[in-house]
Amino acid sequence: KFVIDQIEKLLAVPILEEEGELIYSLTQLKEPATVGEIRVASEADFELIHKWMVDFIEETRIRAFDIESAVRNNIAKGFIYLLLVDGQPVSFAGFHDPVELLGKKIGRVGPVYTPKEFRKNGYASLITAHVTKKVIGQGAIATLYTQAENPTSNKIYQELGYVLVDENRRIKI
């Protein structure tokens, strides 16, 4: 808030603060009880994951991007996993190539999405824990972004062992 106030004074214009994102980093993974089966997504899953990504972007109001290319690329790299319960996909999560930052390897978990009809069953926790292990397995510190105003996702990530390390806010001038 201090930075936003200073920008308003400097520019002499009001600034509209938009929804923020919280940045979490994993301390110690606390694995949830398992249910169902987790598998890496394949090209055969493209349509479903593409639809879920569109839904994810609508719900989270993140900036739009080339969803088709991103989904195809991440499926090809083996970066997207599906959770299936009784053979039906119920949730997915992805991760990104780790990057070197200040001498440390940092890997980002996300996106994580469970359609509304499958929520409140622990599926997001389970798929997030699985993908987190993939990031850690690459020798990276696991991080993720979540909406500041979404208490459910924040609670899930904290229960898995993620701790808040920073916050980003988007602004409009």
Language-model regions: role of each:
Residues 1-3, 143-154, 158, 170-173:
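Conserved beta-strand-loop-alpha-helix junction that forms the acyl-donor binding cleft
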Residues 111-116, 120-137, 154-159:
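Conserved acetyl-CoA-binding loop-helix of GNAT-fold acetyltransferases
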Residues 29-63:
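Short amphipathic alpha-helix that is part of the acyltransferase structural core
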Residues 63, 69-113:
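A conserved beta-strand-loop-helix scaffold within acyl/acetyltransferase catalytic domains
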Residues 1-35:
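Acyl-donor-binding surface of acyltransferase catalytic domains
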Residues 78, 139-141:
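Short, high-confidence coil segments that cap the C-terminus of an alpha-helix
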Residues 11-18, 158-167:
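Conserved acetyl-CoA-binding loop of GNAT-fold acetyltransferases
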